[in-house]
Curated annotation (Swiss-Prot):
Protein name: Protein alpha-1
Annotated organism of origin: Bovine ephemeral fever virus (strain BB7721) (BEFV)
Gene name linked to the record: alpha
Gene Ontology CC: membrane
Annotated membrane topology: Single-pass membrane protein
Broad class of the protein's primary localization: membrane
Membrane spanning residue stretches: 38-58
Amino acid sequence: MEKGLLSNFWNDFKRWSEDRKVEIVIWWSNLESKVRLGFWIILIILLGILAIRIAIKVYQCVKFTNQGVKKIKRIIKRKRSIKKYRKT
């Protein structure tokens, strides 16, 4: 008798899980294009933010390097020691 109850429960559970699986597949196929579009939008935004941060770092580095080159040229022209121009 218990075997019959368990087999009925198991059959009901299998049927229920198959129904849920079909519902999830239908839901996912309807949602897929929107999710894909959202993923690409988020990816493009993140890549844009990353590109802006890299550009800012490169600009700061170039700006700092140009200032350093100008200082070195000025020091060489005046033929003074570099120690006087260094900040401690």
